[in-house]
Design a protein with these regions (language model features):
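Intrinsically disordered, compositionally biased charged tails
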Residues: 1-3, 226-281
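Long, charge-patterned amphipathic alpha-helical coiled-coil/hairpin "stalk" segments used as oligomerization
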Residues: 87-194
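Single conserved hydrophobic/aromatic residue that forms the stacking wall/gate
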Residues: 276-278, 282-297
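Histidine-centered active-site/metal-ligand motif
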Residues: 15-18, 188, 286
Length: 297
């Protein structure tokens, strides 16, 4: 079953492309027709591409991989932030920092700087600074938070990029291509799909369009995360089973040993008792005989 249907896409305006004069010929396979000078995207192909991309994204999430969502255009920023956060993925919705991927160690240093400032605030070091220094550091922290706050948990290069408007985010796409990182993208009729690994032909200018596509993608990722969680629980249970079995066997063995010890002790006591009783009987007989002899005398 498809994750999106034709009617959903139609209602969200996913089919609206750009003016014919702005089109990119490489998008011809995904264009259904032209109407009033505007290209109309073939939604059946969009459905197929969404399903394909969603399945791959689901597997990435299931493997615990990180996917970086990128959308700096006004119409898509909030949608991307909400959807990416819902599945615990990093995102960039402000200006793309040059070298974000190709110079990732430098980006990590900037993120660590944020952590250092936070530590200064907690341990009281910040309070010992002058007003001017406090102001400078506060501004620096706010600037870093705005640009990098949403990727704090990205400790290594992402396994994939999901881009809304590949033309606007061409720097991000180029960096990913250079590093061999797969790119998923919502590609409109004015963009070049050749550098995108998983093309989703769609209107990237309408908020509803972005919301529908991302909704399907993130739903698939959430399924992958849930499956990963379930597998982890099963693995832990499978790991615990032999331990519980060993404990049960040890308890049974301990109980058996205790019973054997008790039986041995009881047998020993019984034997001693029987021996004492026999000895007592012999002594009694000896006394009786001695008394009889004495009487005869």
């Amino acid at each position: 079953m498809s994750r999106v249907n034709f009617d959903q896409l139609l209602e969200a305006g996913v089919h609206f492309g750009h003016l014919k004069r702005k089109w990119n010929p490489a998008m011809a396979p995904y264009i259904f027709m032209e109407r009033n000078g505007i290209h109309i995207i073939d939604l059946y192909k969009t459905v197929a591409k969404v399903d394909e991309a969603a399945e791959v994204m689901k597997n990435l999430a299931k493997q615990g991989k990180k996917v970086l969502f990128v959308a700096t255009k006004k119409q898509a920023k909030q949608v991307v932030a909400d959807k990416a956060a819902s599945v615990g993925m990093p995102y960039v919705i402000e200006r793309w920092p040059g070298g974000m991927l190709t110079n990732f160690p430098t980006i990590r240093k900037a993120i660590k700087k944020m952590a250092t400032i936070d530590k200064m605030t907690k341990d009281g070091t910040f309070d010992n600074l002058s007003k001017r220094e406090k102001l400078q550091i506060t501004r620096q922290r706010a600037k870093l938070e705005k640009t990098l706050g949403s990727i704090v948990d990205l400790t290594r290069l992402p396994s994939a990029l999901f881009v809304v408007d590949v033309m606007k985010e061409h720097i991000a796409v180029r960096e990913a291509n250079r590093l061999g990182i797969p790119v998923f993208g919502m590609v409109d009729t004015n963009s070049n799909p050749n550098n995108i690994d998983y093309v989703i032909p769609a209107n990237d200018d309408a908020t509803k369009s972005v919301e529908v596509i991302l909704g399907a993608i993130c739903e698939a990722m959430n399924e992958g995360l849930q499956e990963r969680k379930a597998e982890k629980i099963d693995a832990e249970a499978a790991e615990e089973a032999p331990k519980r079995e060993r404990k049960a066997k040890a308890a049974v063995k301990k109980e058996r040993t205790k019973k054997e010890d008790d039986d041995a002790l009881n047998a020993n006591v019984a034997g001693k008792f029987a021996k004492d009783r026999k000895s007592t009987r012999l002594n009694s007989s000896h006394i009786t005989i001695s008394y009889a002899v004495f009487c005869l005398k």
